[in-house]
């Protein structure tokens, strides 16, 4: 009976673990700039205007994974920071879109845009600059 209980517990733990897709940071292929993780974090935390940031929808798993891996923050911490910046008039928050396909469209339309998508969604319309 004990091996069955152990197996059941192991299955529950594995099933409860979040399954995140691998996130990549992308830019327009015409953009030849090399970009570091710190530079990307600064753009997404309102400390730099080097790029126009595109955010995935609030509450999405990929958004949480991106902020954790690139900015070392929860998505909720980043949202709170942006609320403060907007309230004080110091910055405009990233444009929010609903999916990786929408991020790719926004990147294709703006050579200064930067965004993040699942690695599996990468195609020739975008250039990967970071795999955190």
Tell me the role of every PLM-derived stretch:
Residues 9-13, 95:
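Short N-terminal leader segment in a subset of presequences, especially plant chloroplast
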Residues 22-132:
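Flexible loop/hinge segments at secondary-structure junctions
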Residues 15-21:
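Sec/Tat signal peptide C-region and signal peptidase I cleavage site
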Residues 1-10:
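Bacterial N-terminal signal peptides that target proteins for export
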């Amino acid at each position: 009976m004990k091996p069955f209980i152990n197996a059941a517990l192991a299955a529950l733990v594995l099933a409860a673990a979040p399954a995140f897709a691998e996130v990549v940071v992308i830019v327009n292929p015409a953009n030849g700039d090399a970009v570091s993780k710190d530079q990307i974090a600064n753009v997404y935390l309102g400390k730099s205007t080097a790029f126009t940031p595109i955010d995935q929808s609030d509450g999405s798993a990929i958004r949480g994974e991106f902020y954790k891996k690139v900015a070392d923050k929860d998505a909720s911490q980043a949202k709170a920071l942006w609320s403060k910046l907007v309230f004080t008039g110091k910055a405009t928050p990233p444009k929010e879109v609903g999916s990786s396909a929408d991020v790719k469209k926004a990147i294709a339309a703006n050579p200064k845009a930067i965004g993040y998508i699942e690695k599996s969604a990468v195609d020739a319309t975008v250039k990967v600059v970071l795999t955190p």
